[in-house]
Amino acid sequence: MTPIAPSLQQPVDAFLRYLKVERQLSPLTQLSYSRQLTALMRLAQEIGVTDWTTLDAARVRMLAARSKRAGLQSASLALRLSSLRSFLDWLVSQGVLHANPAKGIRTPRSGRHLPKNIDVDEMNQLLEIDLNDPLAVRDRAMLEVMYGAGLRLSELVGLDCRHVDMAAGEVWVMGKGSKERKLPIGRTAVTWLEHWLAMRDLFGPQDDAMFLSNQGRRISTRNVQKRFAEWGVKQGVNSHIHPHKLRHSFATHMLESSGDLRAVQELLGHANLTTTQIYTHLDFQHLANVYDAAHPRAKRGKS
């Protein structure tokens, strides 16, 4: 494989340092940028671009066309061009480029499908776990919190004990772009957190992480995914259970009950309303009121 020219690589390395140090983006987002820009640099060399100052709109279209021919789907191609636009915007801000040649170049639109979710009956079936050991209590608490608050997997794993106000039934989470938000979690989730916290010390906690592995360390995302899938099979739920499906189900059930798109946007932590609109075929008190009135586990108060 031909080495990437330093005239392409060095500006990309500087941009990635900017994303890490100044923007403080998550490691996964940084990795996504790195992968997309590495692929683009290799394609750029194939079409004779060895310096970013020689990239023009015609060559950007060539990069998009080659990516498409390589089998990239519309959503992935849109992500690649978005990464390129962000990088070129940064080069403009650094005085390397006078204008962004990728501005205005769009990929063909692909239909956005409603994410698959679990219906309320299946969700109740999943959550009726036989609590025969502390790990089952931990898993029940994780399931209740994830579905009860619509958390991202990274937000669930990153939750610390100090982030939870049990009396108020609220959690503080750090979402995408290091944006913090306060969320209601409902009475049922609070109850199961209390059950879990009564057993947490059995795991020999090594820090303030809310959910622990057998070794007393913060549970990993891979472990959560594995445990959720296993519980789906054990509970006889027809749907394959993975963490993001619980978030989709939270959003769908909330919208079905409340019809309040803006409130659900805030609860999910979406920066743009259009992201939340895929679920449709303010102040915190308002969000809490919508939540209490609409979320199945808040209304039932099951334990």
Curated annotation (Swiss-Prot):
Pfam families: Phage_int_SAM_1, Phage_integrase. Residues 113-292 form the Tyr recombinase domain. Keywords: Cell cycle, Cell division, Chromosome partition, Cytoplasm, DNA integration, DNA recombination, DNA-binding. GO terms for biological process: cell division; chromosome segregation; DNA transposition. It is found in: Cytoplasm. It comes from the Bacteria. GO terms for cellular component: cytoplasm. Disruption phenotype: Defects result in partial SOS induction, inducing some overexpression of the nuclease NucA protein. Residues 6-92 form the Core-binding (CB) domain. Its main location: cytoplasm. FtsK may regulate the catalytic switch between XerC and XerD in the heterotetrameric complex during the two steps of the recombination process. The keyword Ligase does not apply. Gene3D superfamilies: 1.10.150.130, Intergrase catalytic core (1.10.443.10). Forms a cyclic heterotetrameric complex composed of two molecules of XerC and two molecules of XerD, in which XerC interacts with XerD via its C-terminal region, XerD interacts with XerC via its C-terminal region and so on. This is Tyrosine recombinase XerC.
